[in-house]
Amino acid sequence: MTEPITIGVDHGYAAMKTAHCSFPSGLAEYEHEPYTQKNVLCYDGKYYVVGSGRQPLQKDKTADENYYLLTLAAIAKEIAYRNAPTTTPVILAAGLPLTSFGREKKAFRAYLLREGKPVSFSYEGISYETSVQDVKLFPQGYAAILQHSDLLNEPSVILADIGGWTVDIMRLDNRIPYAASCRSLELGMIRCLDEIAEQVRRSLNLSLT
């Protein structure tokens, strides 16, 4: 039996990221097979071009199948990068916003786990028969600072995780997160770029694309 591999996936509003790949969080559905296999996911008889455009903002990522489909693409990319068998089972590691971690944890875990049942799909013409055996969830940003022992020795540290849609802020006192200081602000890069484009349009009557 093939041993499972652990794959970390960042389900961003702007991009999906793993240790070895990154692609826009866009998804375009096609009724028939597209003319190319590049970035094409086939699941449940439907075709999707992964990384096409940008997802409309949805605060609840479990509201539809889009982020699950993007996760399948991320799994395929990681399995291919590691030259692992296409039947390799997977343990997923993912993050959730600091302020909604407890509230969203159960639903997001079930959304990704799918009861650990086998899942069949193809990506870029290669067939995969895998399963998600476990899902481990962590507060966004916190894992990153644990790699910097010099910062952890500070009596107080402010962590700012700047993402596509949100900026997550956490204070650590003597290595321990101070829960009351956690904030998730809708001031990420998407909002920033949209605001810049709007100001340029108003001031210069130019459109940034």
Regions found by a protein language model. Name each.
Residues 162-168:
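Ser/Thr-glycine-rich phosphate-binding loops at phosphate-binding pockets of nucleotides
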Residues 171:
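A short helix-loop
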Residues 1-159, 174-191, 203:
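Nucleotide/phosphate-binding catalytic cleft detector across ATP-hydrolyzing
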Residues 200-209:
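A mobile "lid/hinge" subdomain adjacent to the ATP/sugar-phosphate binding pocket shared
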